[in-house]
Amino acid sequence: MKLQLMICLVLLPCFFCEPDEICRARMTHKEFNYKSNVCNGCGDQVAACEAECFRNDVYTACHEAQKG
């Protein structure tokens, strides 16, 4: 269970406005549905997965802001 949580937290560097494609590549081992922007779960660490979804919204918005 601790290992799953650690894996969930691997995404943290994406918070710092990395390009979208890098974040997506970093997330390929996760159960995250980008097309619908929905977390399908991260093992039994649902809260951690929901936090990832929130961070995804934040860095996607940041990336969009960088384009402008």
Swiss-Prot record:
Signal peptide: 1-17
Keyword annotations: Amidation, Disulfide bond, Secreted, Signal, Toxin
UniProt miscellaneous comment: Arose via modification of ancestral neuropeptide hormones (ion transport peptide/crustacean hyperglycemic hormones (ITP/CHH)).
Protein name: U1-agatoxin-Ta1a
Location within or outside the cell: Secreted
Stated role: Toxin that paralyzes insects. May have a direct effect on the insect central nervous system.
Single GO molecular function: toxin activity
